[in-house]
């Protein structure tokens, strides 16, 4: 299930920071938890029971070293999960407390609407609404460190497959019948964001997906890759001409 939240800035000439994922995540979890405390554990789970998009600003100006100046009347945030109780808790929490703060800018929720589900096929074109994060671990000296992977890295697809199967099993309770898929990269842009106190590198991508419909549907609903609950891995479907 997927929703769109319209937000109205409460200040003139609003400028939001480039790094806002953790602020949004914390406020969404707090609002939903105030209504339905039992879903907080799911919202905080690293297995990614849900995902959300970057803030969609249809008219904007990038101000280097400062942030994004909002030139449109409103902005949009998309949230998705295969778990209807999660979406219900988020919606009810936001309706009860319809204010958000991003950086120094306050926002008021103007509208929340459910979006129609798209048909998932064996071949789909996906475009990211937030960067896809795929990581591995490597030794540097005597220390084990996380290493972020991009689509051109040899380990990217293998690691993405493993992550999606692990998350599918944890969230859905079993494994998909068809476990195999591959992707064909169409467009790619690397990103680096600060989440809490850590740098996370991800991939904004347009890609053609081939294979398991179950994993495709799971990724569409809950996000592709890792850290989806922190606002990574959300995709939309592009209709092929």
UniProtKB/Swiss-Prot annotation:
Keywords: Antiviral defense, RNA-binding
UniProt keyword RNA-binding present: yes
GO MF annotation: an example: hydrolase activity, acting on ester bonds
BP GO annotations: defense response to virus
Family: Belongs to the CRISPR-associated protein Cas6/Cse3/CasE family.
Function: CRISPR (clustered regularly interspaced short palindromic repeat), is an adaptive immune system that provides protection against mobile genetic elements (viruses, transposable elements and conjugative plasmids). CRISPR clusters contain sequences complementary to antecedent mobile elements and target invading nucleic acids. CRISPR clusters are transcribed and processed into CRISPR RNA (crRNA), also called psiRNA (prokaryotic silencing) in this organism (Potential).
NCBIfam families: cas_cas6 (TIGR01877)
Complex and partners: Binds crRNA.
Protein name as it appears in the record: Putative CRISPR-associated endoribonuclease-like protein Cas6
Organism expressing this protein natively: Pyrococcus furiosus (strain ATCC 43587 / DSM 3638 / JCM 8422 / Vc1)
